[in-house]
């Protein structure tokens, strides 16, 4: 059901356009955070993977859009035999840069878990900023490829 209800989990499965790192270098916390993207920016999902047995009560992470983020999946839910650490309600994005993103949210992160958040009220300005960011990332990758070919 989760997979069917959220286009970001399937729309761009066969292309890199459906994935974007938020932070892949939190080695000291054993955590990875990334985006799953779809054709509509409002369908973007934020995925938090905690490979540590530690919970974090106030984990700040960068997000691409203004708006409200709601936890839609938590592998640590008590119904799955987890500890029940969860984010109830919504987490409103603050205009505080984090992880090279213009906004951030503060969440509770469950131990040994995967948590997925959907975004609501994604502003048009943020959609444009995200598009510009993707274009810049694409140019950087092309430059790196050219540099490698010269060697």
Where are the model-predicted features located?
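Carbohydrate-interacting/catalytic domains
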Residues: 1-151
């Amino acid at each position: 059901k989760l997979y069917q209800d959220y286009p970001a989990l399937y729309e761009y499965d066969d292309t890199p356009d459906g994935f974007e790192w938020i932070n892949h270098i939190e080695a000291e916390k054993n955590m990875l955070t990334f985006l799953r993207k779809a054709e509509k920016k409002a369908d973007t999902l934020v995925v938090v993977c905690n490979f540590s047995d530690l919970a974090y009560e106030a984990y700040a992470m960068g997000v691409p859009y203004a708006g409200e983020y709601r936890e839609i999946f938590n592998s640590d839910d008590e119904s799955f035999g987890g500890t029940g650490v969860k984010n109830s309600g919504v987490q409103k994005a603050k205009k505080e840069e984090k992880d090279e993103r213009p906004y951030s949210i503060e969440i509770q992160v469950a131990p040994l878990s995967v948590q997925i958040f959907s975004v609501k009220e994604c502003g048009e300005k943020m959609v444009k900023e995200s598009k510009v960011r993707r274009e810049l990332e694409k140019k950087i990758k092309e430059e790196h490829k050219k540099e490698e070919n010269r060697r």
